[in-house]
Amino acid sequence: MAKGIFLTGTGTDIGKTYIAGLLVKTLAEAGKRPAYYKAAMSGNDRRPDGSLLPGDGAFVKTFSGIDQSLESMCPYVYEHAWSPHLAARFEGPPIDLEVVRAGWRSVCERYDYVTMEGSGGILCPLRWDAQHIQLEDVVKSLGLASILVAEAGLGTINSVVLTAEYMKAKGLPLKGIIFNHYHPGDTMEEDNLAMCQALTGLPILATVQEGDTALRMDPEALAALYEEVKL
């Protein structure tokens, strides 16, 4: 039975895809048969044939070296670098939760450890027409616990605590925090980490520095964060 985790962030451009690549790479190198999944990707380039290249998936695939097909990584790929609900309104098709679930099941049937990345932060709207679907609806539907990705620098305390408190109020379990763009020995960043841990009660799972190609975390400890998925 496959195991899964959801990767959310305190906002856009926090580095979730980069962290996802590190997680998948770490598991792959430990022989865990990992995979990657994302409900919707925005801001993608077109191939010469006019089709859209799922950029986040392409990065994770190349960075981690996994053999998973790009087509299986994301059911909804948009060109505009907008929130998925808006990109879908202009480009179509709108996101269908059952399609997302079906894609997730398909990946989980073929791989052992599946990392699902969110779009933006946990409050990101995926569809906003006759139906209202937010990212948290996907997380609840799939029954996934989450890892929170945050910046190590100035302003992160507020963003981390707000996200953690919101997820707690919504019944969305968090396993811990990974801090990106960390500078060892930086007084402010070290205090940021300590304050975030104190104010949220969440463990710091790892810190990631610019250009890291390996996660400073034991592969077995990482694998233990993933929980059995309910298909």
Regions found by a protein language model. Name each.
Residues 128-152:
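Inter-motif core of Ras-like GTPase G domains
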Residues 165-231:
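C-terminal lobe/tail of nucleotide-utilizing enzymes
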Residues 33-34, 114, 146, 174-175:
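Hydrophobic anchor at the start of a short beta-strand
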Residues 4, 18-94, 98, 103-106:
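N-terminal phosphate/diphosphate-binding loop that engages ATP/GTP or pyrophosphate donors
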Residues 100, 104-131:
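Switch II (G3) loop of P-loop NTPases
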